[in-house]
Regions:
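A conserved beta-turn-beta hairpin within the catalytic core of GNAT-like acetyltransferases
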Residues: 30-40, 180-192, 202, 225
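A conserved beta-strand-loop-helix scaffold within acyl/acetyltransferase catalytic domains
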Residues: 141-197
Length: 264
């Protein structure tokens, strides 16, 4: 358990979800049916037989996420979860193979961070004030961080980077982390994203560069060469950024079951 050593991030509701997720993860982390990169415990794959399991996750955690639900199963799954009293949302999954590393290298070789910005890779020496600044920034931009233990605890396979201006204010972020069990078929694929850029600095390619640098760090430090992310349907800027780094929609979605009572 956390025991105050590591922080939870996001809104008060998100922190409650992360606290619940950490406790659940201690119980089931050796079961490859489940996965987690530090924000919530998920089911690794969606099929008819695990709908009730997803509902149970939602009731225990506040949300129950099922990754990689094929398009033909989404409506049946949504209907079944709604009949259990849960609210349901979905996001499109974008995936990229090892060509993403080639794309990331091309981006990094062609771009530089604006001279007034400082690039920081979050580690155990990062000050609490910087972490708190990143937390507030990502909350404001709807891109919540993984819990601190998944970012900084020894042995965790993750990367979080930020760009700061001359006043120490956060301008952009990106993060990625191991998601699947080591025995899962997709164990070499990391969750990537959590991208955000300050409004007055958009259009300068900062998010693209940070996203590429994050991928390369995950590859160099932890050996990942495949990545996936979840994008809300119609989020054209995110879709375009994904395309530049070699991630494409693959006809699956993340289905999110939400316990409405948790947020009251």
């Amino acid at each position: 358990m956390n025991q105050g050593e590591y922080a939870y991030f996001g809104s008060s509701d998100n922190q409650r979800i992360q606290r619940n997720a950490e406790a659940i993860w201690e119980l089931i982390r050796n079961d490859p049916r489940f996965c987690c990169h530090g924000r919530a415990v998920s089911l690794a794959k969606g099929f008819e037989e695990n709908i009730q399991l997803q509902a149970s996750l939602a009731l225990l955690q506040g949300v129950g996420i099922c990754d990689s639900v094929p398009s033909w199963h989404i409506e049946n799954r949504r209907s079944a979860l709604e009949k259990l009293g849960l609210r349901v949302e979905q996001m499109e999954i974008f995936r990229g193979g090892n060509h993403t590393i080639t794309s990331a290298r091309s981006v990094v070789s062609a771009r530089n961070l604006p001279e007034d910005l400082e690039l920081i890779y979050i580690d155990e020496d990062t000050s609490k004030s910087v972490l708190q600044g990143i937390d507030a920034f990502t909350q404001y931009h709807g891109a919540s961080l993984p819990m601190e233990s998944f970012l900084l605890k020894p042995g965790r396979r993750s990367v979080c980077i930020t760009a700061l201006d001359g006043h120490g204010n956060v301008v952009g972020t990106s993060a990625a982390g191991a998601h699947f069990h080591r025995n899962h078929a997709r164990c070499d694929e990391a969750f990537w994203g959590m991208l955000a850029t300050r409004e007055d600095r958009r259009g300068q390619g900062i998010a693209l560069l940070l996203g590429a640098l994050c991928m390369l760090a995950m590859n160099e430090r932890h050996g990942f060469d495949k990545f996936f992310t979840a994008v809300k349907k119609g989020n054209t800027p995110s879709e375009r950024l994904c395309a530049k780094l070699g991630l494409k929609p693959n006809d699956t979605s993340a289905v999110i079951a939400i316990d409405p009572d948790f947020f009251q």
